[in-house]
Regions:
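Catalytic NTP-binding/metal-coordinating core of nucleotidyl cyclase/transferase enzymes
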Residues: 1-11
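Cytosolic nucleotide-utilizing catalytic cores of signal-transduction proteins
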Residues: 14-249
């Protein structure tokens, strides 16, 4: 971990030293690197481009290490040294609170949550998922949910977008199984927001979908068996007299 952090710190210095007046890079809490840039306003566009390139370079670099992903949080610009502590806190907020652990992209700090998730971007995956739910195939559902989350990761969705996608998959399952009236959006929202990682969210959605399929299948089988069971009961109640050979004779 320390090796990776030192390498990231070095890459930060290489990326920004040529266009800054001062640059301070430091490892924070053994899990992040903090970079403070002092530059002329005329370099703003150059800095923005370098931040984007820096994020992409780190993403490629960390692909060589299992279980490592990069999150970059960028604060708004400040114009006086008295505001530096504010900028640092803003960058922490941008990196830590706006994105799930282990996922991310370069983002500006802002107070409003991002909710850019669009089901249209997952149309093909949804059609396969809906087919798996409709035919009540738990393993196929699990596979399609994994596909949705992989696509979401490739798109580097924001945390709130992952939440929205998980809620959408659950709501869709209720709709397809025709049990939408039992879907409690507030309860599900609260449960989802208590999950801290993408893996936790994905696994929860899989478990819930598979459980709903299991319950719906059982209920459907009971409905299909009910007429048969009622017929058996009727036969037992009305045709229980035994006919012996003597009676026949």
């Amino acid at each position: 971990m320390q090796f990776v952090l030192r390498k990231i710190m070095q890459k930060a210095e290489d990326a920004f030293s040529a266009c800054t007046i001062d640059l301070i890079a430091a490892v924070q809490s053994n899990h992040s690197v903090q970079v403070l840039l002092n530059y002329f306003q005329t370099e703003q566009e150059n800095i923005d481009n370098r931040i984007t390139d820096f994020f992409n370079e780190l993403s490629d670099y960390l692909e060589n290490f299992q279980h490592y992903r990069i999150t970059v949080g960028v604060s708004s610009e400040v114009e006086s040294f008295e505001q530096i502590s504010t900028a640092i806190e803003m960058s922490k907020e941008a990196a830590a609170s706006r994105l799930f652990k282990g996922n991310g992209r370069r983002i500006e700090y802002c107070q409003e949550p991002h909710t850019l998730f669009s089901p249209k971007d997952f149309q093909n995956e949804y059609e396969e998922f809906a087919k798996a739910v409709e035919t009540m195939q738990p393993d196929a559902c699990q596979y399609q949910i994994h596909k949705c989350f992989r696509l979401a990761s490739d798109k580097a969705l924001f945390a709130s977008e992952f939440y929205a996608m998980g809620l959408w998959l659950l709501r869709s399952t209720y709709d397809i199984l025709e049990i939408a009236d039992t879907f409690d959006v507030d309860v599900q929202q609260e449960v989802l927001e208590n999950l801290s990682t993408v893996a936790d969210l994905r696994d929860y959605v899989i478990r819930q979908v598979q459980q709903l399929i299991k319950e719906s299948r059982s209920e459907r089988e009971n409905r299909e068996r009910k007429p048969v069971l009622e017929a058996i009961v009727y036969m037992k109640e009305h045709f229980t007299e035994k006919i012996t050979l003597e009676d026949v004779a």
